[in-house]
Regions:
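Phosphate-group recognition and catalysis centered on beta-loop-alpha active-site segments
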Residues: 1-589
Length: 589
């Protein structure tokens, strides 16, 4: 009696099952297909790619915007009157969405490599579409609410551009294996690689320079003291900044109802004091409508322990926490005395009181009186307000005149301005060189990250204002600096390695395809085993089955036209006529 073995003998493919199961919920082998993906599924793959790329840019934006997280939270506070760290939910949602789409992208690329049909599961489609729409909404919101922050992307590319180019080159080179299997897209992929190879021609960075031309390390100015280590605008904050070896102290000055200049950034006292406890009916009033006695009675440190704006309270000692709780609002006179005692400079901006304020017209003279009554030298004070500048120069001629307005050099000289205080988005390398050549110093704010500090250093700025002097203190040299020749060598080397790998991939793919085709042409379909007398491994059975299918397609032979037994080990073979059914056997008899 002849035993027959079924044609469909499968080997376990756990990895492939997981791949198609997670991506398209196709866990069974009969659900998979090697056919070309439909236009509908290709459209969803395009949507997935768009979601991934948009999230990649969105993630990069928030990664570089870390320098200005506190500014973002402060803008949210001004709009909602409630202090909260709005970056936490944004970062959590961005990380989740990016991880999800990146995982699906990897699965989709694996489908393409293995020749599997793309068939994204409907739940994945809903989630991907929701991620895309949410990201677009976030981009529109930031463009409306924080539009100026987009500049950080352009500026950061001057620092990260060379490394992003190498990373993109490595990714595209690694995807060469996928691209090589798609013959139709070879020409397009070659164009993409050519563009990537030539990208360094358009990369410009201040850090690509000769080390001999690097200027001195920029001085660090404590912006509102050291607000990451202690409550802003308090004596404790300025003392912490002095411990970090800052060269100057920066503050925002407001005039009280009785004409005392004090330090306050906000229009009201709600955020940085306990005014809601002592004066609940007046908590939304302008800070300048409180007299100095009332202001002095407020705590300027409890809010820092409660809100923990920089996530640093957990690292404070018990002594520092007690000291923080006892901080009060600081006056300009106190700041000037501290600076005089430690031989530091002071730079401040002055806010004019409202029209109903009794010192609305006297605000400049009130600030000048505080300077003249203190023991600080006039040349240690950097005067920023443009109001009544001529009168100020006439009253105290030794004050250092500074401006936060980017003006032509001739006009700066006419006004007697020797220092420009600019936002980092306005500090271009060519402008910095021009001002420095005219003996106008450049101070850039806010600079809280080492990469931005390094970029400003290579650009040639003289000083930076920072909320994080304790971080910049740990940057003795630029994070990276290289000459044009060194960068050119890295560029050419990486391009040559990429070209060699891509050519090797295409050659291997071509040879592998030719080998498979030659193997199918030389294989005899009659070698397929029907008899189970000799049990062959399932892997061999599958291989022979696949070769039979391909050979039948090429030779036009149907599976019902010819079947043979297995000839191995001296066993006889049987044709279709030799295998008789019971009916045929009875007829013959």
């Amino acid at each position: 009696m002849v035993k027959h073995q079924p044609l469909q003998v499968y080997e376990r493919q756990l990895c492939l099952s997981c791949l198609t199961g997670i991506y398209g919920c196709r866990w069974k082998r009969y659900q998979r297909s090697h056919d070309d993906s439909s236009k509908w599924e290709c459209s969803w793959f395009f949507i997935l790619c768009c979601s991934f790329l948009l999230l990649l840019v969105w993630s990069y934006f928030w990664l570089e915007a870390h320098n200005d997280y506190n500014e973002f939270n402060w803008l949210l506070y001004n709009r909602s009157a409630i202090w909260k760290d709005g970056t936490v939910p944004i970062l959590a949602a961005t990380l989740t969405g990016f991880t999800y789409t990146a995982f699906l992208m990897i699965l989709a690329l694996c489908h393409i490599v293995l020749g599997q049909q793309l068939n994204l599961y409907w739940i994945h489609k809903i989630v991907v579409l929701a991620i895309l729409l949410t990201t677009i909404t976030g981009v529109v919101f930031i463009d409306d609410f924080w539009q100026d922050e987009w500049d950080i992307v352009i500026i950061s590319l001057q620092f990260t551009g060379p490394f992003l180019h190498i990373g993109a080159l490595a990714v595209v080179t690694a995807l060469g294996w996928v691209i090589a299997g798609q013959v139709v897209r070879v020409e397009r992929s070659s164009d993409l690689l050519l563009v990537l190879y030539l990208v360094p021609l358009f990369i410009s960075s201040p850090c690509i320079m000769d080390r001999s031309k690097l200027g001195p390390r920029p001085a660090v100015i404590g912006r509102r003291g050291a607000p990451m280590l202690a409550p802003e605008h308090t004596i404790m904050s300025f003392s912490k900044a002095l411990q970090q070896k800052v060269t100057a102290l920066e503050a925002d000055v407001t005039i009280s109802l009785d004409g005392v200049p004090f330090l306050m950034r906000d229009r009201t006292l709600r955020r940085t004091t306990n005014v809601d406890k002592l004066f609940p009916a007046r908590q939304d009033h302008d800070a300048s409508f409180f007299n100095w006695t009332e202001i002095r009675s407020l705590s300027a440190g409890l809010w820092f322990l409660r809100d923990d704006p920089y996530w640093t309270v957990q690292y404070m000692s018990e002594k520092d926490r007690n000291r923080t709780a006892n901080q009060t609002v600081c006056s300009l006179a106190e700041l000037l005395r501290l600076a005089a005692r430690t031989n530091r400079s002071v730079i401040f901006s002055l806010r004019q009181p409202p029209h109903q304020h009794p010192h609305h017209q006297l605000w400049v003279s009130d600030a000048l009186k505080a300077i003249q009554r203190s023991s600080i030298l006039p040349e240690q004070v950097m005067w920023t307000p443009d109001w009544y500048r001529k009168k100020v120069r006439a009253a105290v001629p030794l004050l250092q005149q500074t401006s936060d307005e980017k003006l032509p050099v001739a006009e700066l000289k006419e006004r007697g301005i020797s220092t420009l205080t600019l936002h980092y988005s306005q500090a271009r390398a060519q402008d910095i060189r021009q001002f420095s050549g005219s003996n106008v110093s450049i101070n850039v704010y806010p600079v809280n990250e080492p990469w931005l500090y390094s970029l400003m250093w290579c650009s040639g700025v003289q000083s930076v204002s920072s909320d994080a002097p304790h971080i910049l203190k740990k940057v003795p040299n630029p994070v990276w600096i290289m000459s044009a020749d060194e960068y050119g060598l890295i560029w050419i080397t990486s391009d040559l390695i990429s070209v060699a790998i891509v050519i090797g991939i295409f050659i291997f793919q071509k040879c592998d395809t030719q080998w498979k085709m030659s193997g199918m042409r030389s294989y005899n379909p009659e070698q397929i085993m029907l008899s189970a007398v000799v049990h062959r491994p399932s892997r061999d059975v599958n291989l022979m089955k696949e070769k039979l299918i391909f050979s039948e397609i090429n030779n036009g032979v149907g599976s019902t036209d010819e079947l043979s037994g297995y000839t191995g080990n001296g066993l006889d073979t049987y044709s279709r006529d030799d295998i008789m059914t019971p009916a045929r056997h009875a007829t013959k008899l």
